[in-house]
Amino acid sequence: MQVKIVQVFPCLVLLVKLVLLSVLLPSATGSYHCSNNATQNSYLWRIEASPPIYLFGTMHVPYKKLWDDVPDNVKSVLSLSEHLCVELRLTDSETSKNLSACRYLPKNETLESVLPGGLYVRVLKYFVRIQNQFPKWLFGNASINGLSRIESDRLFHAMIGNWNRLRPVWLLMLISSLSRENVQERSIPLLDVFLDRAAEGMGKNVEAVEVYKEQCRPFNRLNNTKVFVALRKLLDYLEPLADGPISSTDSDLETYNCGDFKSLVSARPILPLPSSSKLPNLTSEEAGDLESINEFLVSQIVYRRNRRMSKTIMSLLSRQRNETYLFAIGAGHFVGERNVVHMLKKKGYSVNRLSVTETIPGPPLPKNIISLGDPSSQLTILNISSTIPTLPPNRPSHVPPTLSPETIARIIQSVFNNTQSIYTVDSVEVTPTTTSLNSATASTTVATPTSSVTPPTSSSSQTRSLTISDSQRTSDDSAFIPSASSGLRYNIGLVCVTLFFVLLIITSAL
């Protein structure tokens, strides 16, 4: 009997490692603490009115990266406010559907027919190389077997979705979002979505400041020829890194938490491209094309939206009200030229930026604030899919993003891999549509899944918006919405099967 136990012991160790790896592997989160907290500024402003209106500058990143470092006075304002106003209600099915549809080419058009041939081949090759990295990004140093490869491929295809139908600018943003960190953090809600859900769970009224067109359409107006230049330069930068652990930087998170976000935002281009000094072989003509793109987007995505947001806030200030409002919008709208705070002050309003040390009396946040903002956090122990992604036939986990200037690349990441969606998948066909390159160009194959997604009929009232002339805005046709979700039944089943085999081996040994 001792011999049998010795023989089965390595199997037991292997199975226990599998369970521990699948349920205990932590997700990548960040927490940054500044050395001089006494003088640290929060991204919280107060408009002196009765009652006051508060403005909070967010970052569109997974909430776990920031929530612990959000100052107490911001959390107090969230607790005492009766209303939370966000850029867009990403939890609203119509908003999500329209944002997704906005990203796609007109009917009967594909990237294969739009992109220059050589550029299309480069995109195909790059996707194949990134697909080969997914098992390493998901499982780390764990051995890569057939099951992990299959699951990695399923997640990859779910994240790139119907990529051949994307407009070129959205293809560029998809490519920039495919990094190890984004894959590992795909199921963590963005801070904006977390605040939205938490406020709604606390019984507060959550309203939208904008509609999807104001955020999406400026990108679709870009000249495709110049977008092709940006896409080529992005691939020039990423291709040498494609066989390694491509990661996004957290330096802006540290800068944000330490109260000096202004310099970073003012110098960063809107498109998710590295700085010009990092782009190889950049000609003066290419640099001019990239600069003209950035100038156009700054005027449309930053300045025009700043004007609209400030008008919305001023309209609210002119009303007779007795309730407190908190506006949680991207921090980039509060810094730089012609920002929201500057426009409010120009109209005579008193707006003060608050220090983290300034106390704001208010009731404490509920103890279950995390589960209100992130319902999936209650399943952490059994969240095997944090390392083994699945695509069950219900409950997809992605919604399209909001587009704010200071973190535009991260916002686009949420379209493909971050927040949980409220869509219901009636049917999912993972029938690969294979695009093969002939031997004259490359021996590369990329499979793209197709999916049928239907938004549910909501029992709640229609999402309220603070914007003006909503009746003049129409919805675009819906389009394919890629999704990849984690299923609780799958998680429990895998753990049960593993434990069953452990007991079976022990029993046979005895």
Curated annotation (Swiss-Prot):
<keyword id="KW-0472">Membrane</keyword>
<feature type="glycosylation site" description="N-linked (GlcNAc...) asparagine">
    <location>
        <position position="141"/>
    </location>
</feature>
<feature type="compositionally biased region" description="Low complexity">
    <location>
        <begin position="435"/>
        <end position="471"/>
    </location>
</feature>
<dbReference type="GO" id="GO:0046872">
    <property type="term" value="F:metal ion binding"/>
</dbReference>
<comment type="function">
    <text>Metalloprotease.</text>
</comment>
<feature type="glycosylation site" description="N-linked (GlcNAc...) asparagine">
    <location>
        <position position="223"/>
    </location>
</feature>
<keyword id="KW-0732">Signal</keyword>
<feature type="glycosylation site" description="N-linked (GlcNAc...) asparagine">
    <location>
        <position position="37"/>
    </location>
</feature>
<feature type="signal peptide">
    <location>
        <begin position="1"/>
        <end position="30"/>
    </location>
</feature>
<keyword id="KW-0645">Protease</keyword>
<feature type="transmembrane region" description="Helical">
    <location>
        <begin position="490"/>
        <end position="510"/>
    </location>
</feature>
<feature type="glycosylation site" description="N-linked (GlcNAc...) asparagine">
    <location>
        <position position="98"/>
    </location>
</feature>
<feature type="glycosylation site" description="N-linked (GlcNAc...) asparagine">
    <location>
        <position position="322"/>
    </location>
</feature>
<feature type="glycosylation site" description="N-linked (GlcNAc...) asparagine">
    <location>
        <position position="417"/>
    </location>
</feature>
<dbReference type="GO" id="GO:0030178">
    <property type="term" value="P:negative regulation of Wnt signaling pathway"/>
</dbReference>
<dbReference type="GO" id="GO:0004222">
    <property type="term" value="F:metalloendopeptidase activity"/>
</dbReference>
<dbReference type="GO" id="GO:0006508">
    <property type="term" value="P:proteolysis"/>
</dbReference>
<feature type="region of interest" description="Disordered">
    <location>
        <begin position="435"/>
        <end position="477"/>
    </location>
</feature>
<keyword id="KW-0479">Metal-binding</keyword>
<keyword id="KW-1133">Transmembrane helix</keyword>
<protein>
    <recommendedName>
        <fullName>Metalloprotease TIKI homolog</fullName>
        <ecNumber>3.4.-.-</ecNumber>
    </recommendedName>
</protein>
<keyword id="KW-0812">Transmembrane</keyword>
<dbReference type="InterPro" id="IPR040230">
    <property type="entry name" value="TIKI1/2-like"/>
</dbReference>
<feature type="topological domain" description="Extracellular">
    <location>
        <begin position="31"/>
        <end position="489"/>
    </location>
</feature>
<feature type="glycosylation site" description="N-linked (GlcNAc...) asparagine">
    <location>
        <position position="383"/>
    </location>
</feature>
<feature type="glycosylation site" description="N-linked (GlcNAc...) asparagine">
    <location>
        <position position="108"/>
    </location>
</feature>
<keyword id="KW-0482">Metalloprotease</keyword>
<dbReference type="GO" id="GO:0016020">
    <property type="term" value="C:membrane"/>
</dbReference>
<feature type="glycosylation site" description="N-linked (GlcNAc...) asparagine">
    <location>
        <position position="281"/>
    </location>
</feature>
<keyword id="KW-0378">Hydrolase</keyword>
<dbReference type="Pfam" id="PF01963">
    <property type="entry name" value="TraB_PrgY_gumN"/>
</dbReference>
<keyword id="KW-0325">Glycoprotein</keyword>
<comment type="similarity">
    <text>Belongs to the TIKI family.</text>
</comment>
<dbReference type="InterPro" id="IPR002816">
    <property type="entry name" value="TraB/PrgY/GumN_fam"/>
</dbReference>
